[in-house]
Design a protein with these regions (language model features):
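N-terminal Rossmann-fold NAD(P) dinucleotide-binding loop
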Residues: 55-56, 204
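Rossmann-like NAD(P)H-binding beta-loop-alpha module
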Residues: 194-215
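Active-site glycine-rich loop that binds ribose-phosphate moieties when present
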Residues: 180-182
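Lumenal/extracellular "mature" regions of secretory-pathway glycan-modifying transferases
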Residues: 163, 174-177
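N-terminal FAD-binding dinucleotide-binding subdomain shared by FAD-dependent oxidases/monooxygenases
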Residues: 2-46, 51-54, 61-170, 186, ...
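A conserved hydrophobic secondary-structure block that centers on an alpha-helix together
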Residues: 184-188, 195-198
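Short, surface-exposed connector motifs at secondary-structure boundaries
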Residues: 192-193, 335
Length: 558
């Protein structure tokens, strides 16, 4: 279904580390060695971009069906996010066994150390997956896709890969600075260092917890308070996991029946069906369970009814404010007036985040009232001229999620248009799996799928099986390619918007509404109808594929 060609010669890569890497190509070029065994002049049935959960799931699924399949990975190893995200304190926010492959040959020979694995343990897990099913033999590492086009005559994609030379310039700042998504593998010693964390999303929270106890001083630059939830991490014994694995097949089936792909689901009643005392008990139980229980296992109207949502926020506020000593900080970190509806931004999980601000060495800088202006040689300068001198900066401001993954690949449609320009006014997909004008191209955990409103491995399994079945149907029916119809894509977009409009998500800027990237369309990017409904709808579309796709037969196979 595709081939790989070399682009024009690029500058010779160097192994010199980047001072401040901000893209996949920056990180990839910082790793030397070869571009992998499959990088050049390749003709395969399927090319997969990325060697994380989704890529590995697709590799095994398609290989099991006899298809020649390889992965192009920008990094230097498998693991996807967990090869990039190695900042201090990085850990997953889904619990074991929700966050793992459902293949018996993998889980029966693996035991976790805790119920919320760190990035180090997740790297070990992906190495284990490779040993069991053989991933790396079909991977080209340090290989960045920068362009791809489809030939309607041959029914194949041609993809281009290249190296990018190191960042040519350095800014004025003389200290150490790294983005959380491109953290160096080597540890940064922050003892006796003045440190700063810019951003209070998941990575900002985790870095703050890691640096707070050891840095000489730490300043956390906050625009919006993080409505974080308790993680409740605990060790897992081998004996406990051996007992649990008897139920894994049932648990893996169940996670696909819950709204968000976790091993728990909404209560079958609304907030005000209960008395105030009963609500308190429900909230308390979910809070003590930890993880996302307080987000997606309380009342079913919590993300839909403003008054119901205020009740959950009041409980959250009471719990968190009791942990913060300073009254002024208490109001900044857990304000009585909610900054936005609870849960319309994906909550982060924390262990002792709020307690860090009880330390004399940890402070909060409000950059909503006084934004960052620029960096100086010594540190961070705010709009009013205040300069914060720091030795180490962690930039935890997030990245262009969901749609950015697709638009950075240099994809060209059969009409000759670039996906990046097509999606500038807003993303257009069919089923959250395909894009009109890009035949035989499928995406997982991206725009208009459950994605950020779901547990990653669960969504990957639902979408990955669909893609494998779609490709099998193409092969079995003598089809050259399928191309989503524009009217079907428009109908799917309308469906995504209508579902989202029933929720509280449109009330604030968040990753669910396109993120905070300047100039990016403000629109829903995730399917908010729940994983079971989504799975049913995409299956019906595959059964009746000629309603949503132009199905082009291969004359040579008829």
């Amino acid at each position: 279904m595709g081939s790989v060609q070399d682009p024009p010669a690029a500058s010779t890569p160097t192994s010199t580390p980047q001072k401040f890497s901000t893209s996949l190509t920056d990180y990839s070029s910082a790793h030397a060695a070869s571009s992998g065994p499959y990088a050049d002049n390749l003709d395969v049935d399927a090319l997969i971009v990325g060697a994380g959960f989704a890529g590995i799931f697709m590799l095994k699924s398609l290989r099991d069906r006899g298809l020649r399949t390889v992965i192009f990975e920008a990094g230097n190893d498998t693991g996807g996010t967990w090869r990039w995200n190695c900042y201090p304190g990085a850990a997953v926010d889904s619990e074991v066994p929700e966050y793992e492959f459902s293949w018996p040959e993998v889980y029966e020979t693996w035991n976790w150390k805790s119920n919320y694995p760190t990035y180090q343990e997740l790297r070990e897990y992906f190495d284990h997956v490779d040993r069991v099913i053989g991933v790396k033999k079909d991977c080209a590492f340090n290989t960045v896709v920068v362009g791809a086009a489809f030939d309607t005559r041959s029914g194949k994609w041609s993809a281009a890969k290249r190296w990018i030379p190191p960042w040519p310039g350095l800014d004025k700042y003389r200290g150490i600075i790294h983005h959380s998504s491109f953290w160096p593998d080597s540890e940064i010693d922050v003892r006796d260092k003045r440190c700063a964390v810019i951003g209070t999303g998941a990575s900002g929270v985790q870095i703050t917890q890691a640096w707070g106890p050891i840095a000489s001083s730490l300043k956390v630059f906050q625009r919006t308070p993080n409505l974080a939830l308790p993680m409740r991490r605990r060790p897992l014994s081998t004996e406990e996991q051996i007992r649990s694995k008897r139920f894994y097949p049932e648990l893996f089936r169940y996670r696909e029946t819950s709204f968000a792909g976790f091993l728990y689901d909404w209560a079958e009643k609304n907030t005000f069906d209960d008395s105030a005392a009963e609500r308190e008990d429900t909230y308390e139980k979910a809070w003590n369970e930890g993880g996302f229980h307080f987000w997606v296992s309380i009342y079913k109207d919590n993300l839909f009814n403003p008054e119901a949502n205020k009740e959950s926020y009041k409980f959250w506020c009471k719990k968190v404010r009791s942990r913060i000593g300073d009254p002024a900080l208490r109001e900044k970190l857990a304000p009585k007036k909610m900054p936005h509806y609870f849960g319309v931004k994906r909550p982060c999980l924390e262990t002792n985040y709020y307690e860090q601000f009880n330390r004399e060495t940890v402070g909060l800088v409000d950059i909503k009232e006084n934004p960052i202006s620029h960096f100086s040689e010594r540190g961070i300068v705010l709009q009013d001229g205040t300069e914060h001198e720091v030795d180490v900066v962690a930039v935890a401001t997030g990245f262009d999620v969901v749609t950015g993954v697709m638009t950075q690949l240099g994809l060209t449609s059969i009409e000759g248009t670039a996906l990046e320009q097509e999606w500038a006014p807003g993303a257009q997909t069919y089923l959250g799996l395909t894009v009109s004008g890009y035949p035989n191209m499928f995406h997982i955990y991206g725009a208009h799928g459950p994605t950020l409103l779901s547990n990653g491995p669960t969504a990957v399994a639902v979408q990955g099986r669909w893609i494998a079945d779609a490709i099998a149907k193409i092969e079995a029916n003598g089809v050259k390619y399928i191309n989503p119809k524009k009217e079907a894509s428009e109908k799917w977009k309308k469906r995504v918007v209508e579902l989202n409009d029933k929720t509280l998500f449109p009330s604030t800027t968040s990753t669910y509404m396109g993120g905070t990237i300047p100039g990016k369309a403000y629109e829903p990017v995730c399917y908010s109808g729940g994983l079971p409904t989504y799975a049913k709808e995409i299956r019906e579309a595959l059964d009746n594929w000629e309603e949503g796709f132009d199905v082009v037969r291969d004359a040579a196979k008829l």
